[in-house]
Regions:
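Short, well-ordered beta-to-alpha junction loops that form the rim of enzyme active sites
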Residues: 109-111
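A metal-dependent hydrolase metal-coordination microenvironment
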Residues: 1-104, 115-117, 123, 129-154
């Protein structure tokens, strides 16, 4: 079975999200999406399995010293307080916590900021986000560089 999905969506609970879960799923359905991953910043919000006929994937976007790492398909919330006990966590610590919670770790929009040095990360994600509209608006070649990074990692 094939699904059309957006695996990086923020609700109004994130500083850069504007919509409620109800509004997001209605818009996703109208756009022809079958599923969306709710990945609010540093917040693991429980979500119903479906809303407005759209499959909801539980997730969280974690701010780390190496950029953002998104956890998808989390079976339980991340221990964000434990991760941040000494400030921003290392990316590898976030990946380990995501894996402990049954999730998939995604390096999110690695080149969104000019001069980002994502090649310097000390961990191996399960995936690299290769298409992000906001990243492309900020840095023209961000998505192309992210796709090349994924390919170089064999992902």
């Amino acid at each position: 079975m094939t699904y059309k999905a957006d695996l990086h969506v923020h609700t109004a609970a994130s500083l850069d999200g504007l919509s409620s879960l109800e509004e997001l799923t209605a818009a996703a359905k109208e756009a022809g999406l079958d599923a969306v991953a709710i990945t609010d910043h540093n917040l693991c919000t429980p979500v119903p399995q479906r809303l407005n006929g759209v499959l909801l994937i539980p997730g969280c976007e974690v701010s780390t010293r190496q950029g953002h790492v998104t956890g998808l398909f989390l079976e339980e919330p991340l221990d964000l307080e434990g991760l941040r006990k000494n400030g921003l966590p290392q990316g590898g610590d976030a990946v380990e916590e995501i894996h402990r919670r049954g999730g998939i770790a995604v390096l999110a929009h690695p080149y969104q900021s000019p001069g980002a040095a994502s090649e310097d990360f000390d961990f191996r994600p399960d995936c690299v986000e290769g298409a992000n509209a906001r990243a492309a608006l900020k840095v023209k070649e961000a998505n192309e560089r992210a796709a090349a990074l994924a390919q170089s990692l064999g992902l």
